């Protein structure tokens, strides 16, 4: 995973909501094997930090003002090619989440932050091979 120099999984948080970033930081760092190395409130800031910090994982909100997560995702992949990207959104599965998955992100619906912690924690256990992105099942009227 992108030449990890630290024994901890290095994570970049990109979400416009400060409370989500705070809770994610507290949950992730409580694991002891994860270090949040940066935070961004907007996609373009996340792209810049990904290039500077070279994180092992990026937790990326899909809906943000300015550059959204779907637009930022390929640029983050270019800036930090080895990083696993976990896309977060309160949106149900649909075109935006499908696009993120097609770009190689693992999608987790807010507020299931414990799944994010489990996924990022698994990187510390599994070493350089990131888990494969999973496409969630469509449910309800959106499935039509």
Residue ranges of each PLM-predicted region?
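Non-catalytic signal-transmission and effector/linker regions of two-component phosphorelay proteins
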Residues: 1-10, 114-144
């Amino acid at each position: 995973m992108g030449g990890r120099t630290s024994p901890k999984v290095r994570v970049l948080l990109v979400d416009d909501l400060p409370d989500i970033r705070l809770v994610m930081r507290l949950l992730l760092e409580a694991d002891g094997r994860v270090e949040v190395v940066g935070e961004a409130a907007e996609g373009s800031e996340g792209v810049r930090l990904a290039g500077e910090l070279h994180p092992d994982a990026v937790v990326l909100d899909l809906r943000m003002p300015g550059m959204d997560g779907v637009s930022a995702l390929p640029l983050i992949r270019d800036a930090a090619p080895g990083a696993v990207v976990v896309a977060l959104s309160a949106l149900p599965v649909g075109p935006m989440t499908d696009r993120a998955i097609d770009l190689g992100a693992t999608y987790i619906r807010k507020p299931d932050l414990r799944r994010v912690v489990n996924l990022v924690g698994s990187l510390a256990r599994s070493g350089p091979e990131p888990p494969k992105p999973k496409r969630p099942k469509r449910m309800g009227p959106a499935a039509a």
